[in-house]
């Protein structure tokens, strides 16, 4: 009889672990999506800067007179 009571508890523990894992995976996926959105925004800003003023942008990185 005691073994019959242990199985549901073990199954319940596994279910709770599965739920915790699923929650963690969902949070990680959401964070990855947020980071991708931020990166896309940064790349869009760079692209628009290059489209409107590429020469000035490049010149800001070029050293002059051996500096």
From Swiss-Prot:
GO terms for biological process: modification-dependent protein catabolic process; proteasomal protein catabolic process; protein pupylation. The gene is pup. Residues 1-36 have a biased composition (Low complexity). Protein modifier that is covalently attached to lysine residues of substrate proteins, thereby targeting them for proteasomal degradation. The tagging system is termed pupylation. The N-terminal unstructured half of Pup provides a signal required to initiate unfolding and degradation by the proteasome but is not needed for pupylation, while the C-terminal helical half of Pup interacts with ARC to target proteins to the proteasome. This is Prokaryotic ubiquitin-like protein Pup. Residues 23-61 are annotated as: ARC ATPase binding. The keyword Transcription regulation does not apply. Pathway: Protein degradation; proteasomal Pup-dependent pathway. Residues 1-38 are annotated as: Disordered. One of its GO terms (molecular function) is proteasome binding. It comes from Bifidobacterium longum subsp. infantis (strain ATCC 15697 / DSM 20088 / JCM 1222 / NCTC 11817 / S12). Strongly interacts with the proteasome-associated ATPase ARC through a hydrophobic interface; the interacting region of Pup lies in its C-terminal half. There is one Pup binding site per ARC hexamer ring. Keywords: Isopeptide bond, Ubl conjugation pathway. It holds the Pfam family Pup. InterPro entries: Ubiquitin-like_Pup (IPR008515). There is a cross-link at residue 67 (Isoglutamyl lysine isopeptide (Glu-Lys) (interchain with K-? in acceptor proteins)). The keyword Nucleotide-binding does not apply. HAMAP family: Pup. Belongs to the prokaryotic ubiquitin-like protein family.
């Amino acid at each position: 009889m005691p073994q019959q009571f242990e199985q549901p508890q073990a199954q319940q523990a596994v279910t709770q672990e599965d739920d915790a894992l699923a929650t963690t995976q969902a949070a990680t996926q959401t964070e990855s999506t947020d980071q991708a959105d931020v990166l896309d925004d940064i790349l869009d800003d760079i692209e628009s800067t290059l489209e409107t003023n590429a020469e000035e942008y490049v010149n800001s990185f070029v050293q002059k007179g051996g500096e």
